[in-house]
Swiss-Prot record:
GO terms for biological process: ribosomal small subunit biogenesis; translation. One of its GO terms (molecular function) is structural constituent of ribosome. InterPro entries: Ribosomal_uS4 (IPR022801), Ribosomal_uS4_bac-type (IPR005709), Ribosomal_uS4_CS (IPR018079), Ribosomal_uS4_N (IPR001912), S4_RNA-bd (IPR002942), S4_RNA-bd_sf (IPR036986). The lineage of its organism: Eukaryota, Viridiplantae, Streptophyta, Embryophyta, Tracheophyta. Residues 72-134 form the S4 RNA-binding domain. One of the primary rRNA binding proteins, it binds directly to 16S rRNA where it nucleates assembly of the body of the 30S subunit. With S5 and S12 plays an important role in translational accuracy. Residues 132-154 are annotated as: Disordered. CDD domains: S4 (cd00165). This is Small ribosomal subunit protein uS4c. PANTHER family: 30S 40S RIBOSOMAL PROTEIN, SMALL RIBOSOMAL SUBUNIT PROTEIN US4M. Keywords: Chloroplast, Plastid, Ribonucleoprotein, Ribosomal protein, RNA-binding, rRNA-binding.
Amino acid sequence: MGRGKTPNLGEFRVATDQSASRKISQFCVRLEAKQRLRFNYGLTERQLLKYVRIARKTRGSTGQVPPQLLEMRLDNVIFRLGMASTIPAARQLVNHRHILVNNRIVDVPSYRCKPKDIITVRNRPTSCNALKGESPGGGETPDHLTASLSEGSRPTGLVNRIANRESVSLNINELLVVEYYSRKA
């Protein structure tokens, strides 16, 4: 009688952690590297594939080109300058036409910045209010960018040069991303 009512704990098998004992495949390693890169920059699969295809066409190391292209995107430059707290917030600033590049309104977050580009905030109250909580230079500004305050305490940024591998703060093996996409294209 007592045996039917109380479960015998010895009869249940102890579940082993199979994920720790199983070897991770090379596909999984490449997929994780690609997903880390994608989610860090807030890109869609198609956008990242486009950057990898551009990298294949260029001369030099194919693995170093996608991070350079991603670091030179306008939304990422605004984030690195400290004008926005996150990359999605930087995308919103650009989409809402608060950002000027070389004194021209740019509303495309994927705009590729070039050396000597000057990035400022529009001189209107709503643009200044959008940046109230942000402060330029709050974090470590990469060496390919320069952050400052212009007249009227508007945040300003300058792109000194194209980003190199040292200025990219991600711990991702870019070759794994390129290898992942070598099957697709």
